[in-house]
Curated annotation (Swiss-Prot):
Disulfide cross-links: C104-C111, C269-C273, C312-C349
EC class name: hydrolase
Peptidase A1 domain: residues covered: 73-394
PROSITE patterns assigned to the protein according to its UniProt record, in alphabetical order: ASP_PROTEASE, PEPTIDASE_A1
Protein name: Napsin-A
Residues making up the signal peptide according to the UniProt record: 1-16
Tissue note: Expressed at the highest levels in the kidney, at a moderate level in the lung, and at low levels in the spleen and adipose tissue.
Annotated GO CC locations: alveolar lamellar body; extracellular space; lysosome
Start and end residues of each stretch annotated as Disordered: 391-419
Glycosylation sites: N85, N128, N149, N331
Keyword Protease listed: yes
Record-level GO BP terms: membrane protein proteolysis; surfactant homeostasis
Glycoprotein is among the record's keywords: yes
Organism for this UniProt entry: Mus musculus (Mouse)
């Protein structure tokens, strides 16, 4: 090899970021929910009533799964050998992986409208048989634990424990656009004490670091929902720097929030409060009195179930709503927090702030869902012996300028199931 070629090769290798090669990318699909089919905000009022229990014991805690009817971001995973594909919600507010099973109860309506895992079709399946149950306000989801290989993005054959759902209650699951849920919360949230998928991938050496990040695309064009990145974050997705906020209670991704401000006037959470960053929640929720004051300051008016509406035409003139986290203000414009019911700038729009009183010991809490996360990239870092668990936030790069580049990159990592 000539000295010139050797020099060029060294320069090329020196410019490569070693961490980039280790990132696992999972495309997210954005699904537009039909408001006429099901009110996408249904079930929120049940959040304070929902508790999770396991047949193997453990302390009850709140698991707001009915909120998923309003979630718009989904991805594809595979279970078994060969992989059986499922559309799942990647949820930072829970820690279990579950999908419907071919062994589900005949009267479990949700099973008949979704993809089901068939253990007989997988050569790598291992039975566990331990029963699990998750209690909801509308009934109990129950099933058995099993073990098999998980395929996600560029990761193959991650051996995980997951739930085969045998009974899924109510229309909430039957009408859902997703088959199951992949939890990305901490192990303390896991029903049955099972090892969460993220922990399994790290333990098996498939991920170098227990870190993942979300890049959500709230652009109304197409179904491209952005990207879940496992093992780190992609600097091309955000404008530095990242602001890291320590996790206060490692169960949900819960942090301390210093305050909330509307424009240059109203201040909320004045003495500080707790907030959860939750990818499984679409809106921003908070204590009813504070949300009522916030929406009033914006100019919205109440409707049902803690929802507020506003004239769509007012969106460009609405004040910013700012959240003080880690000593930095994170701002949302009217374009960020106003949700169109119809693809039109006339008529009524939903405001992305909803009243929700979560009782003690879990509450009171603010939940910062996709309305908050949309303009930002969120990095969820479990930490190590030197750094505790934390969440990093940075302003996302413009979606319009990098849409084509991301589509090309996504195609290289994972082929989505049609539909």
């Amino acid at each position: 090899m000539s000295p010139l070629l050797l020099l060029l090769l060294c320069l090329l290798l020196g410019n490569l970021e070693p961490e980039e090669a280790k990132l696992i990318r999972v495309p997210l699909q954005r699904i537009h929910l039909g408001h006429r089919i099901l009110n996408p905000l249904n079930g929120w009022e049940q959040l304070a009533e929902l508790s999770r229990t396991s047949t193997s014991g453990g302390n009850p805690s709140f698991v707001p799964l009915s909120k998923f009817m309003n979630t718009q971001y989904f991805g594809t995973i595979g279970l078994g050998t060969p992989p059986q594909n499922f559309t799942v919600v990647f949820d930072t507010g829970s820690s279990n992986l579950w999908v419907p099973s071919t062994r589900c109860h005949f009267f479990s309506l949700a099973c008949w409208f979704h993809h089901r895992f068939n253990p007989k079709a997988s050569s790598s399946f291992r039975p566990n048989g331990t029963k699990f149950a998750i209690q909801y306000g509308t009934g109990r989801l129950s099933g058995i634990l099993s073990q098999d290989n998980l395929t996600i993005g560029g990761i193959h054959d991650a051996f995980v424990t997951f739930g085969e759902a045998l009974w899924e209650p109510s229309l909430i699951f039957a009408l859902a656009h997703f088959d199951g849920i992949l939890g990305l919360g901490f192990p303390t949230l896991a029903v049955g004490g099972v090892q969460p998928p993220l922990d399994a991938m790290v333990e098996q050496g498939l991920l170098e670091k227990p870190v993942f990040s979300f890049y959500l695309n709230r652009d109304s064009e197409g179904s491209d929902g952005g990207e879940l990145v496992l093992g780190g974050s992609d600097p091309a997705h955000y404008v530095p720097p990242l602001t890291f906020i320590p996790v206060t209670i490692p169960a949900y991704w819960q942090v301390h929030m210093e305050s909330v401000k509307v424009g240059t006037g109203l201040s909320l959470c004045a003495q500080g409060c707790s907030a959860i960053l939750d990818t499984g929640t679409s809106l921003i929720t908070g204590p009813s009195e504070e949300i009522r004051a916030l929406n009033k300051a914006i100019g919205g008016y109440p409707f049902l179930n803690g929802q507020y509406f506003i004239q769509c035409s007012k969106t460009p003139t609405l004040p910013p709503v700012s959240f003080h986290l880690g000593g930095v203000w994170f701002n949302l414009t009217g374009q960020d927090y106003v949700i169109k019911i119809l693809q039109s700038d006339v008529g009524l729009c939903l405001l992305g702030f909803q009243a929700l009183d979560i009782p003690k010991p879990a509450g009171p809490l603010w939940i910062l869902g996709d309305v908050f996360l949309g303009p930002y990239v969120a990095v969820f870092d479990r930490g190590d012996k030197n750094v505790g668990p934390r969440v990093g936030l940075a302003r996302a790069q413009s979606r319009s300028t990098d849409r084509a580049e991301r589509r090309t990159t996504q195609a290289q990592f994972f082929k989505r199931r049609p539909g």
